Amino acid sequence: MKLRSTALVKGFRQSAPYVNAHSGKTVVIMLGGEAIADPNFANIVNDIALLNSLGLQIVVVYGARPQISHLLTSQGYTTPYHKGIRVTDARALELVKQAAGQLQLDITARFSMGLNNTPMAGAQINVISGNFIIAQPLGIDDGIDYYHTGRIRRIDIDGIQRQLNQHSIVLLGPVASSVTGECFNLTSEEVATQLAIRLKADKLIGFCSEQGVIDLDGEVASEMLPNEAETALQRLIEAQEDDCGTARFLRGAVSACRAGVPRSHLISYKEDGALIQELFSLDGIGTQIVMASAEKVRGAGIDDIGGILDLIYPLEQEGILVRRSREQLEQEIEQFTIIERDGLIIACAALYPFPDEKIAEMACVAVHPDFRDGDRGVILLNRLRQQAKEQRLKHVFVLTTRSVHWFLEQGFIESDVEQLPMAKKALYNFQRRSKILVLAV
């Protein structure tokens, strides 16, 4: 008898909305030399190939900093850095080209694998590299001549887009030529960032040794706005870690975000499957830098009824919430406020006003179990209090059997049935014996 894995089926079904959401989207992936040297790199290539098969348009930008440094050291040669950028003289340039060229061949070979019983079986991926980027010299800064270190002059966006439209993966490295036929050493951060901006990419993805950006509590920050990412970058600079992979990515991510790239993701190159977990699960695994929060608080509409029913059904089954039918929700949908994340309703609450008695009921408060550690309940409470104020009401009340302490922590006080509005008092269920809690608006 064949073994059946319900976990596989469940995971596949849960990922379906993300497969649909990401299909056809443009993603720029920045692979530093550290990621390429890690034993997990083969799995990263497999995961990128999977993204390609799912219809994502992918540009891979690889760096070669540790490989270049190793090659220079093996030749007994060192190069100075100025403002975190390598000064590349003529001798160093030859070694840079050697290291970058070797990596290009190795990465292309990885994507070309097609052995049976491997994740690459039948993939048949076309990897395209070329002179899509034209460079120019970085010049002299503070009296320091960068020689053959350069920056981007222009990018052939149309040429890259043609390759992406043909379902090819575009692979670009840290060496580009100029209009004079010279070669220049570029930073992979600049290449990836500028590509993401000019391609109007949907995502910029980078890899570091950690799971993402580590906050002051030692935890992975799941989401950051650009100003928060800048603060994290400043902490790294003050700790003299401004040359680490996280710092280099954050610089690019902040620039990309402010130039219109909706999301940048930072994940670990050591974690097997991090790329898939980040893109195809509700809360991801790393850190994303976003133009605006991925969560939106808004009034509910008819199209949200299915999502609200899915959210509250488990709580109704446990007896925590009173059951609401689809028909009832359709009639009352304008009373609901929701928190939405990536198209999924993760929290809801409703406000039912009794204007004659200057009071309103806060009801059907529910938060998705994966997001109960945050302050989403408080966010909904504050939004509903504001709505009550705007309606010139003086109090809100709740009926609850399980969440008494949480409401008390938010400033509610216990009351009794006599304090309920007349219409609600007539419907009070004495068998359920819900606690009545009231809060001044």
Swiss-Prot record:
Keywords: Acyltransferase, Amino-acid biosynthesis, Arginine biosynthesis, Cytoplasm, Transferase. It is found in: Cytoplasm. Residues 295-434 form the N-acetyltransferase domain. GO terms for molecular function: L-glutamate N-acetyltransferase activity. Pathway: Amino-acid biosynthesis; L-arginine biosynthesis; N(2)-acetyl-L-ornithine from L-glutamate: step 1/4. It catalyses: L-glutamate + acetyl-CoA = N-acetyl-L-glutamate + CoA + H(+). GO terms for cellular component: cytoplasm. Its main location: cytoplasm. InterPro entries: AceGlu_kinase-like_sf (IPR036393), Acyl_CoA_acyltransferase (IPR016181), Asp/Glu/Uridylate_kinase (IPR001048), GNAT_dom (IPR000182), NAGS_kin (IPR033719), NH2A_AcTrfase (IPR010167). One of its GO terms (biological process) is L-arginine biosynthetic process. Its EC number is 2.3.1.1. Belongs to the acetyltransferase family. ArgA subfamily. This is Amino-acid acetyltransferase. The gene is argA.
